[in-house]
Swiss-Prot record:
The keyword Ribosomal protein applies. Transmembrane segments: none annotated. One of its GO terms (biological process) is ribosomal large subunit assembly. SUPFAM superfamilies: Ribosomal protein L20. InterPro entries: Ribosomal_bL20 (IPR005813), RIBOSOMAL_L20_CS (IPR049946), Ribosomal_protein_bL20_C (IPR035566). This is Large ribosomal subunit protein bL20. It comes from Bradyrhizobium sp. (strain BTAi1 / ATCC BAA-1182). GO terms for cellular component: ribonucleoprotein complex; ribosome.
Length: 119
């Protein structure tokens, strides 16, 4: 069996890491050891924050809904309770969008939720 020199493979691997580390500051962009560590850590942050993004957006929608229902003398929790009692199954993302872009439609939903709470 012939001897295989690893130069081509190593160069390809390094090139892949440096491409991912493009734009990093200092040695992180041009030293293989630090670049590899930085790319690995960036991947960990990306994985963690893809999960966190879902929580953050849900919290944003809830804050928007709470602010949107306050003029109707409701709190967020009472509003959601009214929605469930009236059988309206619209998620928070859509409700938040309605509150911003379609105030008339949102008002109609709030009135139905209030009616369900009163009954």
């Amino acid at each position: 069996m012939s001897r295989v020199k690893r130069g081509v493979t190593a160069h390809a691997k390094h090139k892949k890491v440096f491409k991912a580390a493009k734009g990093y500051y200092g040695r992180r962009k041009n030293t293989i050891r630090t670049a590899k560590q930085a790319v690995e850590k960036a991947g960990q942050y990306a994985f963690r924050d893809r999960k966190r993004k879902k929580r953050t957006f849900r919290a944003l929608w809830i804050q928007r809904l709470n602010a949107a229902v306050r003029p109707f003398e409701l709190t967020y929790s009472r509003f959601i309770d009214g929605l469930s009692k009236s059988g309206i199954t619209v998620d928070r993302k859509v409700l938040s969008d309605l509150a911003i872009n379609e105030p008339a439609a949102f008002q109609a939903i709030v009135e139905k939720a209030k009616a369900a709470l009163a009954a």
